[in-house]
Amino acid sequence: MDGDIAAALPPVNQQSKADGTAVAAAAAAAACHGDFEPSVWGDFFVTYTSPPSLSQEPEEQMRERANFLKGEVRKKFEAAAAMSAINSAMLVDAVVHLGIDHCFREEIATALRSVHKEEGEFGSCDDLHTVAVRFLVLRQHGLWVSADVFDKFRDDTGSLSKSLLCSNPRGLLSLYNAAHMVTPEEKVLDDAIAFARSHLEAMIGELRSPMVEQVSRSLDIPLPRFSRRLESMHYIAEYGQEEGHDAQILELARLEFELVRSLHLRELREICRWWRELYNDVKLPYARDRIVEIYFWACGVIHEEEMSRARMIFAKTFAFTSLIDDTCDVHATLEEVQKFNEAMQSWEEDAVSIVPEYLRTLYSRTIKGFQEFEDMLEPNEKYSMSYVKKAYKLLLQYYLKEATWANENHTPSFKEHVQVSIISSGLPMLVPVLLMGTGLATREAFEWADSAPDMVLASGEVGRFLNDMASYKLGKNKKDVANAHECYMKEYGATGEEAFAFIANMTENAWRKINQACMEMDPAMLPAFKVAVVDLSRSMEIIYLGGKRDAYTFGSNLKDLVTSLFLKPCA
């Protein structure tokens, strides 16, 4: 099967096979000329048909079996609750990890209330893995639990005990991941992260599958910051190798994964056709041709079957924004950016007359596209479009601000750069887009997001700083405004590596602010913002890999992940 897929795939750009130095050099050269790598995929997904062996059995039979298994898993929640809170915590962790938690929202909420309440049962537990899993699942669902639960694993000096922990890779990995639910000023978890990381790095060469793969992934991107969809893809292949795994839960996870992937492939075909028509219509050859990567990104944020509308709105909004961003960054003059922005602020079709001629089709298609999004909404949801338009207009204003800086060759202060660039990252704009598309948010939630709360701004910081770290490593477009590293270096006389370390630390702090906000938020609003902020921020980690790559600009960096997610059989 893998050989058949490989034969069908478009050839990999040779740059993706080069060593790191060559990749960086090619990236810098391409960026300096505004000459982006062509699409890795072309029209592959427009004509792609799943081979019969990938479909396995008729979809109707798969759904019938999945529905039966859901009933069986609900019984397991009841049985776990009757046994102990520890059993409930382990079951929740498995279901979440395998990506089927959306099937059991009520059961998980009930289980977590018990897990949160039964502190005594966990207080007497001396298994690091169990204690860490409880800490992780509670904090991920907005329930506060003190880091004091790890005190029992410290020695008389207050340090984590090497004798207790260093021969326990599973416990160390769970501690490492759980500790990344840290909030600002929780210094007690900093040493847990450092301790676990150093010992995991030391022992990784001795670990066996699947532990070695799990440790490797988490050392790159900790589990609470990793894409839920990608993690479930990996864990489905690994869970069956774990002692005590549940065969019915694993079967359900495989069925759900394949059913959802079938929908994703249909959506991907549709959006690739939409994009090809749009790209050919607007005639902006300097812009990145990245619709497959955009849709992959959308699935990393919202993969659930019932979220098809949200995925398509997100992906199409992203596509319009990418065309505009590339226009402002690599092609348009300042006057052209000003005219385009002026028209967008009016949001009127007849304002197209003031737009530069070569951008008029882009302007008209963007206005028409957002009207189509509004037409997809229910009557009681249409108010949400006003929040989306407001955020989009703000984004365009900040694009203009950056274009002005670039035109004047102005290097802003680091603080000023951050204030502008977290908005121009596009993430704060995508928050109301996701709230609108998912239908999970109330008017109060839109109002809160519109007030620019720390949680939303922190998401923008994650996206901007990861992007800027990648730009520092790979090179940036010659027309781009100075990035965060350059602003910091100029203002503080720092070296590039010092600036990189400082900005990496700011990215870490942004994640901590997001964690804190999740635990302070009104529980009724949390589900909407876990998607619109947490999962959106997670997707940035995948694209930029901690600032080590820019897999959107250089789509060949994502080819293996796209292939695994959409084309390879579920293990």
Curated annotation (Swiss-Prot):
Cystine crosslinks: none
Its subcellular locations are: Cytoplasm
Q: Where does Mg(2+) 3 bind?
A: 467, 471
Which InterPro entries did the record assign? Isoprenoid_synthase_dom_sf, Terpene_cyclase-like_1_C, Terpene_cyclase_plant_C1, Terpene_synth_N, Terpene_synth_N_sf, Terpene_synthase-like, Terpene_synthase_metal-bd, Terpenoid_cyclase/PrenylTrfase
Q: What induces it?
A: Accumulates strongly following fungal elicitation (e.g. Fusarium spp., C.heterostrophus, F.verticillioides, R.microsporus and A.parasiticus).
Short sequence motif DDXXD motif: positions: 325-329
Question: Which pathway does the record list?
Answer: Secondary metabolite biosynthesis; terpenoid biosynthesis
The record lists substrate as bound by 325, 329, 464, 467
GO BP term, pick one: response to herbivore
Cited Gene3D superfamilies:
Farnesyl Diphosphate Synthase, Terpene synthase, N-terminal domain
What is the uppermost EC class here?
lyase
Residues annotated for Mg(2+) 1 binding in this entry: 325, 329
Which transformation does this protein catalyse, written as a reaction? (2E,6E)-farnesyl diphosphate = (+)-beta-selinene + diphosphate
Please state the Enzyme Commission number of this protein: 4.2.3.66
- What does the entry list under GO cellular component? cytoplasm
What does the UniProt keyword field contain? Cytoplasm, Lyase, Magnesium, Manganese, Metal-binding
Q: Which residues bind Mg(2+) 2?
A: 325, 329
Q: Which GO terms describe its molecular function?
A: magnesium ion binding; terpene synthase activity
Cofactor(s) it depends on: Mg(2+); Mn(2+)
How and how many cofactors are bound, per the record note?
Binds 3 Mg(2+) or Mn(2+) ions per subunit.
Q: What does this protein do?
A: Sesquiterpene cyclase that converts farnesyl diphosphate to the volatile beta-selinene and the corresponding nonvolatile antibiotic derivative beta-costic acid, especially in roots upon infection by rootworm larvae (D.balteata) and fungal pathogens (e.g. Fusarium spp.).
Its assembly, as annotated, is: Monomer.
What's said on domains?
A: The Asp-Asp-Xaa-Xaa-Asp/Glu (DDXXD/E) motif is important for the catalytic activity, presumably through binding to Mg(2+).
Q: Which family does it belong to?
A: Belongs to the terpene synthase family.
Protein name as it appears in the record: Beta-selinene synthase
